[in-house]
Amino acid sequence: MSAAPVFSRRAVESFVPEGSPRTYQIAPLTYLERQNYRADMTRRCGPLPSQAAMMSALRAAIREASPGNAATLLVTVDDFEAEPENDDLKAHLAALEAVAMGVPVYAEQRALQERHLGMIPWVAAQHALRGWEGERLPPFARERGLVPEDLLGVLPEGELLAVGWKAFSLMQPDQAAAGNSEPPS
């Protein structure tokens, strides 16, 4: 019998970022805490553009940037969607995306995507950190269930990223935990 996944704020893990003399206590978030994390991400960054929205914006950008050649270029996009693991198609798509960045409809979607991805570690750390210890760290505090922004801002950037990504990874059940409960009947 396998153990149930742990998503309790009481199950704190100690984490030491590579090369750091400091230790951070990170808690896997409960269901409600994960919903609050997702809501905060949406408030801060807007919704994460879906793959379909990104591809639609890319198509629109291609039509705008290269109207005379759009039909040929759009075949590459269609082929990539049919074979997303094809390395040649990935390279062609990357070239199209680079050109599309000059078109606002695509550039705005990419900016939303980048902001969202860039904020994941910050917001995850804000929600999941439960303490820290080590040199040159101020006393730990939480206000209204979160680490205050000014306090989080004093962490070295590399450590903040490592802590945040670790916190984010603790929000996702691993493959062993994902299928360890019986489906509802």
Language-model region placement:
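Short, surface-exposed, charged amphipathic helix/loop patches that serve as local interaction elements
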Residues: 20-185
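Short acidic, Pro/Gly- and aromatic-enriched capping/linker segments at domain boundaries
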Residues: 1-17
